[in-house]
């Protein structure tokens, strides 16, 4: 699906997104544990949609949450839902976005297959990690479906620092810098 088609699809789905959302709290908890979401961290939520994980980051005490989605309507809804000072919601392409600071944790949840150039995305996001930071790609599909091997190749190809990709469970793959 081309990028504009993805934007149009999610813009059209935004109004009813939260109503159709199915959450598995145990799986989400495990994903956020693997991602290192704990008090005081800075988080970048990539393809945040309507802010599905923002309440989880807040409950876990994240100091700063930056969320980005390419679909304007998704970003608008997330911005309205979370007006807190420590939450910033942006509309833009995460594979090209620039930020004033690095992040302790970057999470892509249920969105990785929608990126047309996943290697480029991972390479760009790896450069936004603070030392010791973790990039977590998580989806309801298996580790194999996530393309964890592709994630590993992209991370290793950056050549900046030590990149370790591990399949932490069947729901996510983590890149640690």
How should these model regions be labeled?
Residues 1-38, 52, 136-159:
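Conserved class I S-adenosyl-L-methionine
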Residues 42, 133-134:
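Short glycine-centered segments of the SAM/dcSAM-binding site in methyltransferase folds
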Residues 44, 50-96:
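Class I SAM-dependent methyltransferase SAM/SAH-binding core
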Residues 107:
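A conserved beta-strand element that flanks and buttresses the S-adenosyl-L-methionine
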Residues 110-111:
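Short catalytic micro-motifs in class I SAM-dependent methyltransferases
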Residues 119-131:
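A short glycine-rich, Lys/Arg-flanked "PGG" loop and its adjoining helix->strand segment in the class I
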Residues 161-177:
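Short alpha-helix
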């Amino acid at each position: 699906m081309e990028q504009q088609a993805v934007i149009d699809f999610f813009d059209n789905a935004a109004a009813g997104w939260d109503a159709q959302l199915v959450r598995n709290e145990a799986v989400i908890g495990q994903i956020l544990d693997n991602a290192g979401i704990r008090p005081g961290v800075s988080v970048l939520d990539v393809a945040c949609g309507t802010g599905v994980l923002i309440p989880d980051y807040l409950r876990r005490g994240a100091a700063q949450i930056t969320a980005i989605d390419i679909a304007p309507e998704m970003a608008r809804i997330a911005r309205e839902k979370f007006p807190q000072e420590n939450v910033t919601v942006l509309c833009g392409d995460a594979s090209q976005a620039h930020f004033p600071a690095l992040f302790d944790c970057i999470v892509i949840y249920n969105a990785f297959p929608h990126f047309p150039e996943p290697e480029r995305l991972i390479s760009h996001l790896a450069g936004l990690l603070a030392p010791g930071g973790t990039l977590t790609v998580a989806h309801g599909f298996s580790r194999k479906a996530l393309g964890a091997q592709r994630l590993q190749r992209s991370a290793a190809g950056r050549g900046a620092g030590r990149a370790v990709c591990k399949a932490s469970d069947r729901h996510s793959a983590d890149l640690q810098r």
